[in-house]
Design a protein with these regions (language model features):
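FMN-binding flavodoxin-like domain, especially the glycine-rich phosphate-binding loop
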Residues: 12-15, 19-34, 38-64, 78, ...
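Bacterial N-terminal signal peptides that target proteins for export
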Residues: 1-10
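Acidic helix-start/capping segments at beta-turn-to-alpha-helix junctions
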Residues: 62-74
Length: 203
C-alpha cells in the first residue's frame, strides 16, 4: 500500500514538473501577441483565426488596397512580388508598440511574402518586438528562402525568433489539390506550443 502511495505521489510530482514550463510559457505570452495577417484567398486568414484563439492573441487584418481578385489581380500581385514592389495598405501603421510579440502572417507568392506584408515591414519599425513569420503556401520553403523572408524584418530592427509554415495544398495523383481545411487547421494548431516557446525562450 505504501509503495502504491509513493508511486502515485511520484507520478503527481512528475506531471506537475513537466507541465509547469508549458503553462508558464502560455501565461507569459497570453494577451501579448499580435497577429498581422494578410490573406488573398482566405487560407491565411483561416489559420490566423485558429492561432488567435489558441494563443489568446490580438489580430489585425492587413488590407491590400490594390484589387487582387481574379486572375488579373493574382498576376499583378505576382509581378509586384517578383520586383519587390510595395503596395497601398490599410492600416499602414498598425499599433505594434502595445504587443511585444508579433506574428507576421502571409501567403507565399513566388516563395516571398505578399506585397501587403512586405509593405507593413518596410513602413514600420520592429526594434521593440520579437517577431515570428508564419506563411501558408503550396509548398514548404527551405531554410535559405526562409532567411530571405526574414531579412527585411531584421533590417527593420525586429528580432526574428521563429519561422513557421503550413502547406495548404498537397499532391494527389501528380496533381496539386487543396488540402481539407480541417487538416490545415490541425497542422496550424500543432505549431502553438513551439510558437509559445519561441516567444518565451528568447531574451
Amino acid at each position: 500500500m505504501k509503495r502504491i502511495c509513493k508511486l502515485i505521489l511520484v507520478c503527481t510530482i512528475a506531471t506537475f514538473i513537466f507541465t509547469l514550463p508549458l503553462g508558464h510559457a502560455q501565461e507569459n505570452t497570453a494577451g501579448k501577441i499580435l497577429i498581422l495577417c494578410y490573406s488573398r484567398t482566405g487560407n491565411t486568414k483561416l489559420t490566423c483565426e485558429a492561432l488567435q484563439k489558441a494563443l489568446n492573441a490580438q489580430m489585425i487584418e492587413i488590407k491590400d488596397l490594390t484589387d487582387r481578385s481574379g486572375a488579373w489581380g493574382g498576376l499583378t500581385g505576382m509581378l509586384n512580388t517578383l520586383f519587390n514592389m510595395q503596395t497601398s495598405i490599410e492600416p499602414e501603421h498598425p499599433d505594434i508598440a502595445s504587443c511585444p510579440n508579433i506574428i507576421l502572417a502571409s501567403p507565399l507568392w513566388a516563395g516571398k511574402l505578399a506585397p501587403a506584408i512586405r509593405t507593413v515591414i518596410a513602413r514600420n519599425t520592429f526594434d521593440k518586438n520579437k517577431v515570428i513569420i508564419f506563411t501558408t503556401g503550396n509548398a514548404i520553403l527551405d531554410e535559405l528562402n526562409q532567411e530571405k523572408n526574414k531579412a527585411p524584418v531584421i533590417a527593420s530592427g525586429g528580432k526574428v525568433v521563429g519561422y513557421f509554415q503550413v502547406a495548404v495544398q498537397e499532391k494527389v495523383n501528380d496533381k496539386k489539390v487543396d488540402r481539407p481545411k480541417e487538416k490545415v487547421i490541425e497542422d496550424t494548431l500543432k505549431l502553438v506550443p513551439e510558437i509559445n516557446k519561441a516567444f518565451s525562450s528568447q531574451p
